Amino acid sequence: MATKKAGGSTRNGRDSEAKRLGVKRFGGESVLAGSIIVRQRGTKFHAGNNVGMGRDHTLFATADGKVKFEVKGEKSRKYVSIVTE
């Protein structure tokens, strides 16, 4: 008769699914209105001209144009804008 001691149990083995956050359209890229530019938690990037912010802080284009990233203000905040042609 084969004998094998019971393995016991573990309290590890869980991990959450990746949320696919980050910049989706980079500086200089052309976008259409409604395109997602940045998926983020909190406001790492702020909405500039022609950019809207969703309730989960997702930044999206509100007009067609090119993406522009810039650092502005006293607090050196990062803004994302859309420059229309």
From Swiss-Prot:
Gene3D superfamilies from the UniProt entry: 2.40.50.100
Biological-process GO terms, alphabetical: translation
Top-level taxon of the source organism: Bacteria
Region feature (Disordered): 1-20
Family: Belongs to the bacterial ribosomal protein bL27 family.
PANTHER family to which the protein is assigned, alphabetical: LARGE RIBOSOMAL SUBUNIT PROTEIN BL27M, RIBOSOMAL PROTEIN L27
Name of the featured protein: Large ribosomal subunit protein bL27
Organism of this sequence: Haemophilus influenzae (strain PittEE)
